[in-house]
C-alpha cells in the first residue's frame, strides 16, 4: 500500500572544509502506515557533535512513531479523537528519547582534547551537553486513515494533496523564527514544534527535507513545482530514485552548498488513481513557471532601465 525513499548528500561547503555531513534521513514502510524523517545538525562551533545529534533525532522519532503504532487500530482511534493531543504526546516522547540517546552517547564518549581545543576553558564550561548535539527534525507519517507531520527548526514538509496540488502545511518561516534557536537541544523544545494533520482527505504523498533543498530554489513556487515533478515519477520510484539522488547532489554543490536530505512516503493506490491529475498539474505548473520567468525578466529590465536613467541624471548634474 505504501512506498517511499530517502536520500542524504553532503554539501560542497562541508567537503571543502573537511566537515562531516550533518544531515540524517530515513523512511520506513509498514502494512498500516509509513514514515519519512529528516534531521539537520546545526554544525556550528558549539554544536560539534550535531552529526550524531541528527542521527539520534531520526532514531528517536522513528522509535516513537513505531511505539505509538504498536496497536494500529487503537492508535488510529485515539488519534482521531484528539489529533492535537496525540501529536503533542509524540513530540514530548521524541524529545525524551533524544535526550536519553544524547546522555548515553556522551557518557560513553567523553569530550576529547581535540574537541575542546577550539574553546577557552570558560567557554567550554558554558556549553550544555544537549547543545553539543543540536539538530532540527522533520517527521511525516502517512497512515490508513490520516496523515500528519511535525517539525522543529528549519526544513520543509510538502504535501501532495488529493487534487494533485502541492502545498506546505507548515510554512518555512514558521519553523525558522528570527533570533531563536528552534532546536532539539533547546530547553523549551516542546514549545517550538509545529505540526499539521489531515483526516478528511487521502494525500498522494508527503515529502520532508532539510533546508539545503529549500534554499536551493528561487521561490516557494519553484520549490513546490519540484515536488510535483517528483510525485509524477513515484510510480517508477525504484528506477527514478538514483536520478533524485543525483539531482540532490547537484543542488548541494551550488547555492548555499549545504548538506541536503529528502525523504518521501506515498500511498501507491491513491497515486495510481491520481496519476493523470499529477501529469496535468505538472503541465499547469510549467505554464505558471514560464509566466513567472517572464515577469522576473520584465522586472529586471525595468530595474536596469531605471538604474541607467539614474546614472545619466547623476552625470548630467556633475556636468
Task: Indicate where each model-derived feature is located.
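N-terminal entry segment of metal-dependent catalytic domains or homologous docking segments
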Residues: 1-67, 155, 186-190, 196, ...
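Short glycine- and acidic-rich boundary segments immediately preceding or forming the N-terminal edge
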Residues: 1-22, 100-128, 170, 278, ...
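Acidic loop->beta-strand submotif enriched in PP2C/PPM serine/threonine phosphatases
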Residues: 19-29, 125-144, 148, 172-218
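Short acidic-glycine loop/turn motifs at beta-strand connectors
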Residues: 29-32, 142-145, 153, 160-164, ...
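Short hydrophobic beta-strand that contains or immediately precedes a catalytic carboxylate
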Residues: 36-40, 150-152, 207-209
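Helix-loop-helix
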Residues: 59-101, 227-249
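Catalytic core of PPM/PP2C metal-dependent serine/threonine phosphatase domains
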Residues: 75-158, 192-203
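C-terminal catalytic subdomain
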Residues: 179-319
